[in-house]
Amino acid sequence: MSRKLKKTNLFNKDVSSLLYAYGDVPQPLQATVQCLDELVSGYLVDVCTNAFHTAQNSQRNKLRLEDFKFALRKDPIKLGRAEELIATNKLITEAKKQFNETDNQNSLKRYREEDEEGDEMEEDEDEQQVTDDDEEAAGRNSAKQSTDSKATKIRKQGPKNLKKTKK
């Protein structure tokens, strides 16, 4: 390890879970967890520092996956695990892309179908509205005719029977 780190306690829960998974007691000692946490944190800092130096030697300021692979090149087990995780990550992202593309295509198809159904429904509603308008107009005409007929009856009866018709 290159330098002593502050007591970070970044991986306390993970380390205690791993200790239990490998046969330790359910609640390991805090000193044990802290010691392993410092070891893991120091190792990660060293790997990242080596990868950064590799990037600087290549005259780059940003780290790439190849820099981490180069830093792990002397440990074939860790390098193999890193490559396996990278390949798995690529598979997952490709599967998500395919899922999103098919989902987008399906939603586009659904949208088009709904739009076509909506157009058909609008046409039906327009036809319904036209028939309703015709019926309303016919109703108005019949109501108008009935009021006209009442008015003509009143006129025919004259002023004598005006009081009777109002009741």
From Swiss-Prot:
Ranges where the record places region Disordered: 97-167
Sites of Phosphothreonine modification: T131
InterPro entries: Histone-fold, TFIID_TAF13
Sequence ranges of Acidic residues compositional bias: 114-136
Residue runs in coiled coils: 109-129
GO biological-process terms attached to the record: positive regulation of transcription by RNA polymerase II; RNA polymerase II preinitiation complex assembly; transcription by RNA polymerase II
Signal peptide per UniProt: none
Localization terms from the record: Nucleus
GO MF term list: protein heterodimerization activity
Histone-fold domain mapped to chain residues: 10-74
Segments of skewed composition (Basic residues): 152-167
UniProt keywords, alphabetically: Coiled coil, Nucleus, Phosphoprotein, Transcription, Transcription regulation
GO cellular component: nucleus; transcription factor TFIID complex
Complex and partners: In TFIID, TAF13 heterodimerizes with TAF11, but they do not seem to form a heterotetramer like TAF6/TAF9. The 1.2 MDa TFIID complex is composed of TATA binding protein (TBP) and the 14 TBP-associated factors. One copy of each TAF1, TAF2, TAF3, TAF7, TAF8, TAF11, TAF13, two copies of each TAF4, TAF5, TAF6, TAF9, TAF10, TAF12, and three copies of TAF14.
Summary of the function given for this chain in its UniProt record: Functions as a component of the DNA-binding general transcription factor complex TFIID. Binding of TFIID to a promoter (with or without TATA element) is the initial step in pre-initiation complex (PIC) formation. TFIID plays a key role in the regulation of gene expression by RNA polymerase II through different activities such as transcription activator interaction, core promoter recognition and selectivity, TFIIA and TFIIB interaction, chromatin modification (histone acetylation by TAF1), facilitation of DNA opening and initiation of transcription.
Family: Belongs to the TAF13 family.
Other known facts: Present with 2100 molecules/cell in log phase SD medium.
Record's protein name: Transcription initiation factor TFIID subunit 13
Primary gene name: TAF13
